[in-house]
Amino acid sequence: MQSKPGRENEEEVNNHHAVQQPMMYAEPWWKNNSFGVVPQARPSGIPSNSSSLDCPNGSESNDVHSASEDGALNGENDGTWKDSQAATSSRSVDNHGMEGNDPALSIRNMHDQPLVQPPELVGHYIACVPNPYQDPYYGGLMGAYGHQQLGFRPYLGMPRERTALPLDMAQEPVYVNAKQYEGILRRRKARAKAELERKVIRDRKPYLHESRHKHAMRRARASGGRFAKKSEVEAGEDAGGRDRERGSATNSSGSEQVETDSNETLNSSGAP
C-alpha cells in the first residue's frame, strides 16, 4: 500500500523546520561567532523561517502545497539544503564547544573574524563636540585648591623650543695691521669656500696677542707706517740728540748775552 505524497511532504517540511530552528546561546550578540557573517544564499523553492515563525499553521500548509506541486526538483533542493544546514549547525556546535573549553582559541577566532560595524550605527554621522572647558583646570572648578603645575616637575624649567644665541657674545679682541685687513678678509673667504668644497685646510697662525700689539704700538715707525729699522732708529736718535744739544747751546748763549748787557747798564749808571 503506497502512502500519500502529501503526508511524506509534510514530514519532510517538519524535519526541515526542526533543522532550521536557531540555536540559542547565553553569550551576548557581540561575542557570538556568527555576528558579522553574511548569510548564505538559499536555493529557490526553500521556504523562509520568518513566515514559519510568525504563522506556523498557514506557512506549513503553503509549504505542503508548494512541495506537492514542484515534485522531484523541490525534493532534490530540499535534500541539498538539509545537508548543508546540518553540516553548518554541527560545525557551529563543535566550534562553540571548543571555544568554551579553550579560551585562547575563542580569542584567536574573534581576531580572525572581520570587524563589522553594528547595524544601529550604520547611516549615522559622527560629529566631534568641542570641549566646553578650555582652561586646564576644568573651568575653574579646582581654583579653590590653589595653583597646580601641569607637567613633569624636572622638565618645567627647560625651554620647549630652540632659542637663538645672543649677538653680543663676549669675544677676545683681535688686533691686526690696517694694511693686512683686506688680505685677512680675502683669506677668510678662501677658507670658507674650501670648507664648502671639503678640501684640506692647513693650520693657520693665531692672531696677534694683546701684549704684542702694545709692543708694536710703542715701536718707532718709518715713513709709510712700517716699522723703522735699527739703523734708522739709531740715526734718528743721533739726530734728535744733536738737535737737543744745539737747542741747549743756543739757550745758554742767550742767557750769557743778557747777563753782560745788564752788567754794562749797571756800570754806566754808577759812574760819576
From Swiss-Prot:
The residues that make up the annotated DNA-binding region are 205-230
| InterPro entries linked to this entry | CCAAT-binding_factor_CS (IPR018362), NFYA (IPR001289)
Q: Name one Pfam family in it.
A: CBFB_NFYA
Q: Which UniProt keywords apply?
A: Activator, DNA-binding, Nucleus, Transcription, Transcription regulation
MF terms (GO), sorted A to Z: DNA-binding transcription factor activity; transcription cis-regulatory region binding
Summarize the protein's role: Stimulates the transcription of various genes by recognizing and binding to a CCAAT motif in promoters.
Q: Output this protein's name.
A: Nuclear transcription factor Y subunit A-1
Gene that encodes it:
NFYA1
